[in-house]
Amino acid sequence: MIRRPPRSTQSRSSAASDVYKRQREKELLIDSESFCMLPWMHLHAYPDGRAYPCCFAFDPYPVGDLNKQSLKEVFNGDKMKEMRVRMLNNQKSRGCMKCYDQEKSGFFSLRLSSNKHFGHNVPLVHNTLPDGEADFVMKYWDIRFSNLCNMACRSCGTWFSSNWYEDHKKLTGSPPPHAKVMKVGRSTNDMWEQMLESFEHTEQFYFAGGEPIIMEEHYRILKELDRRKMYHVRLIYNTNFMRTTFKDIDVFELWNKFDSVSIGASLDAEGDRAELMRKGTVWKDIVANRKRMIEVCPKVDFYISSTVGLVNSLHVTDFHKSWTEQGLIKPADFNFNLLQHPIWQRMDILLSLIHISEPTRL
């Protein structure tokens, strides 16, 4: 007969285990130089199906292909499992080098931000198997359903804008190595059906594109969240802000139903400059959309997500000042994203081209 240990012994053992788990969680979230919460609760996908652990992962190192594999297969594929094992052992992964480089320069990286905002999910780590397999739980979604877009921004290309297709043919003499409009998934409803299986766990959606405001899938998600009354789910957008309606739907009315909505408008300049930099922009419509948004959904967070490069580096601060003075944004509602590609539009080549007589304008 096997005797059970005294209850007090069991309690002490359980308490010790809990203390160890809490200490381990602190080590991972605060002390580790490689751990990131995202590989335990998230996947990112390009419109062509390439899957990554997040949107900031290094392009040459995808972890799967959602046009051939399911979300579950990618989530617990060899590359994701290896990444988790490395993170748990405080070893860095080559696909995460962008975050490591930012941290070396003193920036608050996506890795650090994810550990801060999703750190409450760290108990998921305790179920990780020795080979890195983890429970398939999708808390944060960032699937770029399509490259469908109503614009052709100078700093973009065919992978993220269907409107770039004809320009690419004119510039190169041949079509891109993919369809004009790409859609992620193994079939028409494949991604949607997989999402529904994990919908109940969702904490956050990030919508980008292409242009999410003109994508059918975007509204399908919002309507499903509305049907389930999941208004606590955080919605984050990156949009060119040219459109605020789709068919008979006013997106402002949908946003008003949710507790937390944050709109990052991709605007790099104003007036004629804006229309030059982002082909398809009608500036008066951008201004009208912002004014209507302030009136219709004033509680929705709005900020400008500006890509700063060679073309706008000397006047982007003028744009910020103008919109602040007009009351269209608050001074802090302006993010500067340094352009990395294409390299001939990078801001740092200015130093080899001109003598800066007014360095404060940078």
What residue ranges belong to the model's regions?
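Single conserved hydrophobic/aromatic residue that forms the stacking wall/gate
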Residues: 1-20, 354-362
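Processing junctions and N-termini across compartments
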Residues: 10, 30, 89-93, 143, ...
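Accessory C-terminal segments flanking Radical SAM cores
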Residues: 22-117, 137, 340-353, 357
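Short microdomains enriched in Cys/His and/or Lys/Arg
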Residues: 74, 116-131, 169-191
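Short pre-active-site segment immediately N-terminal to redox-active cysteine/selenocysteine motifs
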Residues: 95, 103, 148-152, 157-160
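Core AdoMet radical
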Residues: 138-148, 157-187, 199-217, 228-247, ...
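Catalytic cores of alpha/beta
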Residues: 311-324
